[in-house]
Every structure is written in C-alpha cells, then in structure tokens.
C-alpha cells in the first residue's frame, strides 16, 4: 500500500527557498551590471574572445560501444 511522503517543515522549506532566491538575485545583478557595461561603452575590463576561425563541424554519429552484429565474435 502506498504511504504518503513525510512533509517538510515550513521553516526548512522557507530556508531553502531563501537560498534559491538569493542565487537568482545574485545572477540578475551580474547580468544587469554586464549589460550596463556593454551599453555604456565601458568595456576596458572585459575580455571578449573572437569567434572561431574555422567553422564548427557537427559531431559524427556517436558510437554505442557495441559492434555491429556481423562483426561480433561468436562464442
């Protein structure tokens, strides 16, 4: 018979939500700061690498690690 999961305490849930929201706010501040720097022309501190000089080729078909049936050893 199925048993319901034990509920988390409200204080623990609030604590975890606070940590997640704090990380989101930190990332948002960094994004806004970078956008202001790029739009304002203050790019002396940014290291921007140029794009790749050669075109990127698509990866060949991934090998699954198994040989085709015709090439397998027979035991």
From Swiss-Prot:
Query: Keyword Magnesium, does the record have it?
Result: no
Q: Does the keyword Cell wall biogenesis/degradation apply?
A: no
Could you tell me which residues belong to the region Disordered? 49-75
Keyword vocabulary terms for this entry: Chloroplast, Plastid, Ribonucleoprotein, Ribosomal protein
Q: In which compartments does the protein localize?
A: Plastid, Chloroplast
Q: Which GO terms describe its cellular component?
A: chloroplast; large ribosomal subunit
Output compositional bias ranges, type Basic residues.
Answer: 59-75
InterPro entries associated with the record: Ribosomal_bL32
Under the heading HAMAP family, the entry gives:
Ribosomal_bL32 (MF_00340)
Q: What is this protein called?
A: Large ribosomal subunit protein bL32c
Q: Which organism is it from?
A: Nephroselmis olivacea (Green alga)
- What's the name of its gene? rpl32
């Amino acid at each position: 018979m199925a048993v319901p999961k034990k509920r988390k305490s409200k204080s623990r849930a609030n604590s975890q939500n606070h940590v997640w929201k704090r990380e989101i706010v930190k990332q948002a501040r960094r994004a806004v700061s970078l956008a202001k720097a790029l739009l304002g022309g203050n790019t002396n501190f940014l290291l921007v690498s140029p794009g790749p000089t050669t075109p990127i080729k698509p990866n060949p078909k991934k090998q699954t690690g198994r040989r085709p049936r015709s090439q397998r050893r027979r035991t």
